[in-house]
């Protein structure tokens, strides 16, 4: 049984200019005290073509964590535009929030992100080179994809084999804040950005 349950993730200040920080309010509950830190990460998927363009925007250690409910605001700087392929700068991508314990990832929350020019003229006639200063970032907060993974919470060698034989599963009990946003008109190829074993969780 998982010792940490993520209760809620709220996307703050959305939509925002591309260069604005990402901000998420995360609530979670520990069924018992954790002696070691939880490591939270925000990862920006720079391109669906290769993980080499993924950017870890920030990583924070939280702990030791006592039993009970906890909440914090996780803020990370915007991705480095120079590391994003120009062909992937405008359009739909993904931002991930992950959490690990003892180096084992036990939850991943993914959001589709649409980067577009709010100026109609720029949308119709985009510049040859992406102008990130004019882009707006819109996170599809109403449609997160949540995947949970079985991990060895106690570092007990006897349970490692059993855990390795278990597949990731979807946690339908996770209640995430749903902030209505305009439809992003996701192209049919975009779902491949998120793991196949992840599903919509409302």
Curated annotation (Swiss-Prot):
Record's comment on post-translational modification: Phosphorylated by TLK2. Phosphorylated by TLK1.
UniProt record, GO biological process: blastocyst hatching; nucleosome assembly
Xref: InterPro entries: ASF1-like, ASF1-like_sf
Inactivation phenotype: Mice are viable but display subfertility caused by altered gamete formation. The timing of meiotic entry and the subsequent gonad development is more severely impaired in female than in male mice. Increased perinatal lethality is also increased in the offspring of knockout females.
Listed SUPFAM superfamilies: ASF1-like
Pfam families with a match to the protein in the record: ASF1_hist_chap
Subcellular location: Nucleus; Cytoplasm, Cytosol
Keywords annotated in UniProt: Chaperone, Chromatin regulator, Cytoplasm, Nucleus, Phosphoprotein, Transcription, Transcription regulation
Family listed: Belongs to the ASF1 family.
The name this protein goes by in its record: Histone chaperone ASF1B
Organism encoding this protein: Mus musculus
Gene that this sequence comes from: Asf1b
């Amino acid at each position: 049984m998982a010792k940490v349950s993520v209760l809620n993730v709220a996307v703050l200040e959305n939509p925002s200019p591309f260069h604005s920080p990402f901000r998420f309010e995360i609530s979670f509950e520990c069924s018992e005290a954790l002696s070691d830190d939880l490591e939270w990460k925000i990862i920006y998927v720079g391109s669906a073509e290769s993980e080499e363009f993924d950017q870890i925007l920030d990583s924070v250690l939280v702990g030791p964590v006592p039993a009970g409910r906890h909440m914090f605001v996780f803020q990370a700087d915007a991705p480095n535009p120079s590391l994003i392929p120009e062909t992937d700068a405008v359009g739909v991508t993904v931002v991930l929030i992950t959490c690990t314990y003892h180096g084992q990832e036990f939850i991943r929350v993914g959001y589709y992100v649409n980067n577009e020019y709010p100026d109609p003229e720029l949308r119709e006639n985009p510049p040859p080179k992406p102008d990130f200063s004019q882009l707006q970032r819109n996170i599809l907060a109403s449609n997160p994809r949540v995947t949970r993974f079985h991990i060895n919470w106690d570092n007990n060698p006897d349970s490692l084999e059993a855990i390795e034989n278990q597949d990731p599963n979807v946690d339908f009990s996770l209640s995430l804040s749903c902030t209505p946003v305009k439809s992003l008109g996701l192209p049919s190829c975009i779902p491949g950005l998120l793991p196949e074993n992840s599903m919509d969780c409302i």
